[in-house]
Amino acid sequence: MMDASDTKGALSGLVVLDLSRILAGPTCTQLLADLGATVWKIENPKTGGDDTRAWGPPYAPDGDGNDSDLSAYFMSSNRGKRSVAADLANPADRALLERLAARADVVIENFKPGGLEQYGLDHATLCARHPGLVYCSISGFGQTGPNRNKPGYDLMAQGYGGIMSLTGAPDGPPMKVGVGIADVMCGMYATIGILAALRHRDATGEGQHIDLALVDAQMAWLINEGVNFLTSGTPPQRRGNGHPNIVPYDVFAASDGHVIIAVGNDSQFVRFCDFIGRADLPEDPRFATNPARLIHREALLPQVATALGRFSMADIIAGLEARKVPVGPVNTIPQALDSDQAHARDATVELARDNAPPVRVLGNPLKLSRTPVRHDLPPPSFGEGTNALKEWLGERENADTAHTDEHKRVD
């Protein structure tokens, strides 16, 4: 049994060759790094590295107070990694990566299907050489199907996958979710797939290929709305903040702002109506049960809204919490991240950097009692881990000026 004082991550000793960029793949490899894996992030010197390094402002300052190559977007999914400057078209760099692949447990990439074949870094080639390798490919539409060669960004995946048709006001246009949820969810599915493949390898010695698509992940994330359609044949519609299967479950206006109220069962509805002074509503057959309330949503919600508008946000939250009815505020991001609850849960972490001010990023929400997540490496500057990788592989080159010049960042 592991000693409680052991602070090694659960994935300590795992080596990851990360050929991904933007958000989906980096989300996955950041999670693996948080859990203790060593992640070597490969970045192309000809393009200045990961595209998201240039997705700013804002940028973290360097030691002189100027913008560094760490955009906030890049920092959101790249802590805990070591950046390696390597051009896949360069034979020497490619040989370096082949040596790394030979020692890696996991390779993850998000090139277009077939894009790595010309470099001999595709899954068929590497898995044939290294049968225990777990190789994860992320693309917009997957390795098969009529759309396999189309590019895929988060916004496109939200559109193709149907989630935008559900998001927004009933009389408004389709809207994307406020953050890159297709990318993030795809990265989480990739993490799950990799851990499952590693478990299989532990049992059999066999690696395998994981084929994951942004659009597939987005469609899987339709959850109840997708199954509502599959069961009823009726396409779901945009309903703002309302719930397709529960009423009342929405954002409501108080006298001084907005609150969220989520009445999940009939007993909660009785207590809710007692608070708003409408004890008559649960006695009305149209509203007595959730299925009835769902049918008569349009008749119920205006009455609820009128009653709630007489109260302040604080009174609604205090009154419903006392009655054990789910209720909460609609926080801004500053309010959410600087709340007492967020501080108690380490929702943000500060990471020290050499010769530059520390950066503050979002923390990992996992709270593991024996193998806590690690927040010990800040997001890397471009190429800062190149020599460390060469040392680890036993082939660091000293005083090769031409090679050093070749890997300077291109702006």
Task: Show which residues each predicted segment covers.
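N-terminal helix-loop segment corresponding to the beta1-alpha1 unit
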Residues: 1-193, 197-203, 377, 381, ...
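Glycine-rich beta-alpha junction loops
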Residues: 46, 141-142, 214-219, 256-258, ...
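Short, surface-exposed loop/helix-turn segments at secondary-structure junctions
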Residues: 53-61, 229-237, 339-353
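Short Gly/Pro-enriched turn/cap motifs at secondary-structure boundaries
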Residues: 65-66, 74, 239-244, 249-250, ...
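Conserved Rossmann-fold dehydrogenase catalytic segment
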Residues: 143, 171-179, 202-218, 237-244, ...
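Oxidoreductase and adenylate-handling cofactor-binding alpha/beta cores
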Residues: 187-208, 220-233, 273-280
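Aromatic-enriched alpha-helical interface/lid elements that frame and gate functional surfaces
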Residues: 247-323, 327, 399, 410
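A glycine-rich dinucleotide-binding beta-alpha-beta segment and adjacent secondary-structure elements
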Residues: 322-376
